[in-house]
């Protein structure tokens, strides 16, 4: 998606509400573009940083964060619905907090959005989401908004735990699978969302094993021990809890261990007329043709 203002000028993603020059509302529109598939080389790029002896360490740290390697689990949630939807998959780095699960949130660009194309309220919500930026800063500062669907997701660790499914303005399609499970007690964004829509808040991690603990206005994101988590109670967080939860999910065909990267493909379509041309042409049927190397 690309950010435009009313005069059809391309603007930066950080200009998420109004263009600083014209004052016009910024919207995000889908646009066919060309990309270099650098995400395919995420691990190679990450390992290559180790050979850059003369680079400042802070620059290498920035590059590592940009590539954003993470370890987690792809979890499958069964869905109750009157639509032809059987399950929803989501990637998470914290499967150990599943017993604190109180909602499932989808990007408005998620494939399941096609089932709501005729819903006028959803289309209004989707248009509103297009005004939200895609940077971490703009998402963090924006009001958390949701569109409640008629879907109900089932917790894979407890079949009796059923929660609502929302489309939400803070979920992006280009990270993970465009779906996140909400654990309000241990993620501030999820907590803000849960309070806005009066959703259940169940803490499942406490800093000390034998002391009472509760969540008020701030999510707890530190280390500790699992509780309110049935057979996972007492596991040390995160050193034991994540591994043990993934082992259980894999053993019962409920999830798969996964390595993920934040690095996106490199968009090269925004070319000036004096820049290097993209070596592609189109035939009379608008089909792309690669320009032979000997013609470049």
Where would I find each of the regions flagged by the language model?
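Auxiliary tRNA-acceptor-end handling modules of aminoacyl-tRNA synthetases
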Residues: 91-93
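A short catalytic or substrate-binding loop motif that flags glycine-/basic-rich loops and adjacent residues
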Residues: 67-71, 95-97, 142-148, 154-157, ...
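Catalytic alpha/beta core of large soluble enzyme barrels
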Residues: 110-208, 213-214, 218-219
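Amphipathic alpha-helical
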Residues: 38-70, 101, 107-146, 295-296
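Residue patterns forming the tRNA-binding/recognition surfaces of aminoacyl-tRNA synthetases
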Residues: 1, 13-14, 18-88, 179-295
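Short, exposed "boundary/linker" segments that immediately precede the start
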Residues: 2-6
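Structured, non-catalytic alpha/beta "coupling" segments that mediate domain-domain communication
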Residues: 95-115, 272-287
